[in-house]
């Protein structure tokens, strides 16, 4: 993906970095799939503002699990990782809700 830094300013000095994250309502749901396997589904991250592929990659590394991005806006992780994902996204500045 193309770098969004078009100003030439160092990334840490850009005032808009992370802007709007608290306004995004991210929802985490766990779904039970075939053979009793669980899948953690994260939706509500705006792909126009955030690099969803990068977030998915970081999440997969954080929870040591496989996963994918569906339809360019939904992150699916293998296994039940609700609490780890919630903490990770809240630390990034997102407003997160977990559904049981």
UniProtKB/Swiss-Prot annotation:
GO terms assigned for molecular function: mRNA binding; translation initiation factor activity
Positions of transmembrane segments: none
Domain of life from the UniProt record: Archaea
Pfam family, one: SUI1
Annotated S-S bridges: none
UniProt keyword terms in alphabetical order: Protein biosynthesis, Translation regulation
Classification via InterPro entries: DENR/SUI1_TIF (IPR050318), SUI1 (IPR001950), SUI1_arc (IPR022851), SUI1_arc_bac (IPR005872), SUI1_dom_sf (IPR036877)
Gene3D superfamilies: SUI1-like domain
BP terms from Gene Ontology: formation of translation preinitiation complex; regulation of translation; translation reinitiation
UniProt family annotation: Belongs to the SUI1 family.
Record-linked NCBIfam families: PRK00939.1 (NF002096)
Name this protein carries in UniProt: Protein translation factor SUI1 homolog
């Amino acid at each position: 993906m193309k770098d969004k830094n078009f100003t030439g300013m160092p990334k840490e000095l850009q005032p808009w970095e992370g802007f709007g994250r608290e306004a995004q309502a991210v929802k985490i749901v766990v779904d039970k799939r075939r053979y009793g396997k669980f899948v953690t589904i994260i939706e509500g991250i705006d792909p126009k503002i955030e690099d969803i592929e990068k977030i998915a990659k970081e999440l997969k590394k954080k929870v040591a699990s496989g996963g994918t991005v569906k339809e360019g806006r939904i992150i699916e992780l293998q296994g039940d990782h609700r609490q780890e994902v919630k903490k990770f996204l809240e630390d990034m500045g997102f407003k997160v809700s977990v559904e049981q």
